[in-house]
Amino acid sequence: MKAVITLLFLACILVVTYGDLICGTNYCKDHPCTSPIARASCRSPATYRANHSGKCACCPACVTLLRERAACKTYSKEIGETPSAVCQEPLKCLNGVCTKVTPRR
């Protein structure tokens, strides 16, 4: 049982650090966006986000912000997935729905 818990703990650490290994603090500086878009190209209801698209979210994009209880999808910036819509802050996409998350104390 102790070995299983240790393996699960190590797997969790690996998952958390994977993003840092791929998208380190200087990734966007070392790999600048090759196809940036202008802020003026975003049309309502989309909003301009400077760091949203491409691998590690190094490029700007026009994004629609979703309200509470809207359908959503989680994505991986490490592999370059770029959703055109994301949950509006401070909402989080949980089980495919934008949900208000109470901060832990």
Curated annotation (Swiss-Prot):
Keyword Transferase in annotation: no
InterPro entries: FPI1, Ser_Fungal_Prot_Inhib_sf
Cleaved signal peptide residues: 1-19
GO MF: serine-type endopeptidase inhibitor activity
Covalent S-S links between cysteines: 23-56, 28-58, 33-59, 42-62, 72-93, 87-98
Source organism superkingdom: Eukaryota
Keyword field: Disulfide bond, Protease inhibitor, Serine protease inhibitor, Signal
Pfam families, A to Z: amfpi-1 (PF12190)
Function: Inhibits proteases from the fungi A.oryzae and R.oryzae, trypsin and chymotrypsin. Does not inhibit protease from the bacterium B.licheniformis or papain.
Full protein name: Fungal protease inhibitor-1
Record organism: Antheraea mylitta
Lineage of the organism: Eukaryota, Metazoa, Ecdysozoa, Arthropoda, Hexapoda
